[in-house]
């Protein structure tokens, strides 16, 4: 099941403290489902601040909020990060369905907010590239697609990013 189901910040911090230093810890932060606008930005920033000294890196799902809110959140995260001596990398996790126009916005954000890396890509709801029979797809049920089902889409995004931001991201 996809989504951001979790027991809450305090429980997550406790679990991390109990297992710290036994692995590389990437933390995917997101807004609360009911948050919009400024509250969504505050959600991102609150988690980032609370977990900054704990994480080895952070990820944010690009499509979790509208582009304008994402840019405002990235502005807030970049401003906070500049106040810290420790650099914790920040990565954007991109969906497989981004248009070229959206990718241009992503590359601008990578430059503007000093994004350290990209995870290309997360799942898609598009089943166009699946080769299973309709009967098989109905048995599988609804939900997002990953793996071979998004290979071509992911490759297109990686190729675009390589051409626009290079190999250092």
Task: Tell what function each PLM region has.
Residues 1-21:
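A gly/proline- and charged-residue-enriched helix-loop-helix capping module
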Residues 12, 25-29, 58-61, 90-94, ...:
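Hydrophobic faces of well-ordered beta-strands that scaffold small-molecule active sites
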Residues 13-20, 74-85, 111, 158-166:
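Surface-exposed amphipathic alpha-helices with a cationic face
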Residues 19-35, 86-88, 155, 162:
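N-terminal small/glycine-rich loop or linker at the start of catalytic domains
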Residues 32-44, 69, 91-111:
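Active-site glycine- and acidic-residue-rich loops that bind
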Residues 41-93:
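Loop-centered beta-sheet repeat module
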Residues 45-59, 106-122:
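Structural recognition of alpha->loop->beta junctions
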Residues 62-72, 111-168:
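Glycine/Thr-rich beta-alpha phosphate-binding loop at enzyme active sites
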């Amino acid at each position: 099941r996809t989504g951001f189901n979790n027991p809450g910040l305090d429980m997550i911090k406790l679990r991390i403290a109990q297992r710290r230093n036994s692995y590389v810890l990437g933390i995917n932060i997101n807004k609360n489902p009911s948050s919009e606008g400024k509250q969504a930005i505050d959600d991102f920033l609150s988690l980032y601040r609370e977990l900054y000294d704990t994480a080895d890196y952070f990820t944010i799902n690009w499509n979790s909020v509208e582009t304008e809110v994402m840019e405002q959140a990235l502005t807030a995260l970049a401003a906070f990060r500049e106040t810290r001596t420790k650099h914790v990398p920040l990565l954007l996790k991109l969906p497989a369905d981004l248009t070229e126009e959206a990718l241009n916005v992503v590359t601008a954000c990578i430059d503007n907010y000093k994004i350290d890396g990209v995870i290309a890509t997360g799942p898609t709801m598009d089943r166009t590239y699946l080769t299973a029979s309709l009967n098989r797809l109905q048995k599988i049920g609804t939900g997002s697609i990953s793996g071979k089902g998004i290979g071509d889409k992911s490759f297109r995004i990686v190729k675009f990013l390589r051409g626009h931001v290079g190999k250092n991201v």
